[in-house]
Amino acid sequence: MLSTNKNRLIEMLSAALTGLAQERGLEAPPTPRLERPKAVDHGDVACNIALQLSKAWKLNPRELAQALVERLQQQTGFNELIASCEIAGPGFSNFRLSNAAKTAVVQEILSGGTSFGESAPADGSATSAMIEFVSANPTGPLHVGHGRQAALGDALANLLATQGIKVHREFYYNDAGVQIANLALSVQARLQGLKPGDAKWPEQAYNGEYIAEIATTFKASPEFKDDIEAIRQFAVAYLRNEQDIDLKTFGVKFDCYYLESSLYTDGSVAQIVGDLQSIGKTYESEGVLWLKTIDDGDDKDRVMRKSDGSFTYFVPDVAYHTSKWNRGFQKVINVQGSDHHGTIARVRSGLQGVAQKRGWDIPKTYPDYVLHKMVTVMRHGEEVKISKRAGSYVTVRDLVEWSGGVTPEMTSEERELALQRGRDAVRFFLISRKADTEFVFDIDLALQQNDENPVFYVQYAHARISSILQQWGGQTSDLASADLSLLQSKASDHLLRCLAEYPEMLTTAAEELAPHALAFYLRNLAGDFHTFYNADRVLVDDQNLKLARLALLSATRQVLQNGLKVLGVSAPAKM
C-alpha cells in the first residue's frame, strides 16, 4: 500500500476514533495501525483497532468496528480512497482500495523513476552511517565467507542509502599479528625451495599455490632480498592487490582501507590500554592484564595483554572502534562471520570504559552487528571444499567464474559477459537468505537459465518487459496519460498491490538490516509479473487497454531495475 494512501486512511481512522471518544466521553485512542491481510480475499488492508480498544472502552469489538466504519463513510474523500469495508471475525476492519487508489502507484513510479521507493531519514534518526565489511586478513585470496560479507555489506549500504543515509564503506586490514608472520614464513619457505609436505615446511604455513606465486613474483622483482621483513611487506602488498582485484570483479568499492598496524604505530592501542587502566577497568593476575568485562554482561573477564607482552586481538579492535566514534560515526554496522560473536561483549565493554574516561556518550549497544553463517559450495551434487589456488577453501574468484560458466577458450568479450552472469548469481544468491542462516550455494543451479534459478527468474522478468516495450515502439512519456482505470483483472490487481509495497518494504528492510527481504520481494514481484503476462495479453487491439497495461509493465520494470541495483545486480534488457 502506498504511504500516501496509508497515511490518508490512518488520518481518517484517527479522526473517526477521536470523534467517537469525545462523543462518548472515552479515553483518547492510540494511533491505529494497518496491516496487510494474510488472505488476499480479505481485502487490501486491515485494522484491528476495534479489538485493541474494546476492553478499555468497554464496548463489543464488532459494534465498535461498525460505528467506526459509519463515521469513516461520512468523511470527505473516503469513498475515493476505499471501495468497500467489511467487519470480519471478532472485530477486524478489512478495507478494499478503490481502483483509483490502487492504480495511482503506476504514475508515481513512472514519475519517480530511479528514485521511486527512496525516502528521507526519519526525525531523530542517523543521517550517516559506517558499514565495515569483508575486513579480510591479507594472508590469502578472499574466500566464500568474505564473498557473503561483500554481498551483504554492499547491499546493506545501498539499502541504507535509499533511506537518505550517507554511507561510508570501510575495510579493516588485519595486517598485524601472528597470521602475517606465518605468511612471511610461508613465502620464505617457498623461496628456499620447500613445498607443503617437506620435512622443513613450517607447521603453521599456508599451503595454497598462491604462496608459490608470491615467491616467484618477489624473486623476479627489483625489491627482492632474503629478508623476512622485506618478504612480509611484499607478500602483504601482493595479497592486498589480489583482494582488490577480486573485489573489483565482484563490483564492490570501499571509501577507506584502515590498517590495523596503524593503531600500533600511532599509539592508539597504548592509549586505549592506558585509559582503561586509569579508571580501574583492568587488573593484573597470573602475569597477564585482564579487562573487567563481566561488569558489562560478559560471562568472564578477558585477557588484554598476554605474559609475553603482546595484546590479544580484541584490544586493537577496541582502539579501532574508538577511532570510528572519534571520526564522527555514531551509527556503525559491522558485517562479520558468526565466529566473531564472542568478541562483541568484550569490544563493547572496552568501549564503555573508553567512553567513561573521555566523557563520551557511546551507547552500550554500539556498534551494531550483522553476523552471517558459513557458506557450503556444491557442484555436480558434491560439496567443494578446496581450491587448487587457495589450497584449503573455495575463493570468491572461483565462485564467480564457476557460476558464470567461464572457460579458458572464451574471448575477452565472452569472458566479461560470463563474469557478469557469475557476479550477478553470486551476489543475488548470497543475499537471498537471512544472514544468520547457513547457506548452500549450488553452482549447477546458478548456471541454469530457467525459473528454478532465482536471479534468472527476476532478470528475465525485466528482460521480457523490455522486449514487450521494444515491440510496442512508443515512448515512456506516452504512458503518462494512460487510462489506468482499465486495469481491473485479478492478475493486474496482484501486480499493483506488490508494486505499492516496494517503498515500505525498503524502509523496513533498512531498519532491520535485512537485505534478504529485498531479494524475497523481487522474486515475488517477478512472479506476479509472469502471472500477469500469462493471463492478460498486453499488445491488444484496444489502444486504451494496451496503453494501460504497458504503463503497468513499464512501472514494474522500473521497480525491478531499482531493486536489482540496490542488490548490486544488473538488469539486462536482453537474455
From Swiss-Prot:
It catalyses: tRNA(Arg) + L-arginine + ATP = L-arginyl-tRNA(Arg) + AMP + diphosphate. One of its GO terms (molecular function) is ATP binding. It is found in: Cytoplasm. Its EC number is 6.1.1.19. One of its GO terms (biological process) is arginyl-tRNA aminoacylation. Keywords: Aminoacyl-tRNA synthetase, ATP-binding, Cytoplasm, Ligase, Nucleotide-binding, Protein biosynthesis. A motif ('HIGH' region) lies at residues 136-146. Gene3D superfamilies: Arginyl tRNA synthetase N-terminal domain, HUPs, Isoleucyl-tRNA Synthetase, Domain 1. It holds the Pfam family tRNA-synt_1d. It comes from the Bacteria. InterPro entries: aa-tRNA-synth_I_CS, Arg-tRNA-ligase, Arg-tRNA-synth_N, Arg-tRNA-synth_N_sf, ArgRS_core, DALR_anticod-bd, Rossmann-like_a/b/a_fold, tRNAsynth_Ia_anticodon-bd. It is an enzyme of class 6 (ligase). One of its GO terms (cellular component) is cytoplasm. Belongs to the class-I aminoacyl-tRNA synthetase family. Monomer. This is Arginine--tRNA ligase. It comes from Polynucleobacter necessarius subsp. necessarius (strain STIR1). The lineage of its organism: Bacteria, Pseudomonadati, Pseudomonadota, Betaproteobacteria, Burkholderiales. The gene is argS.
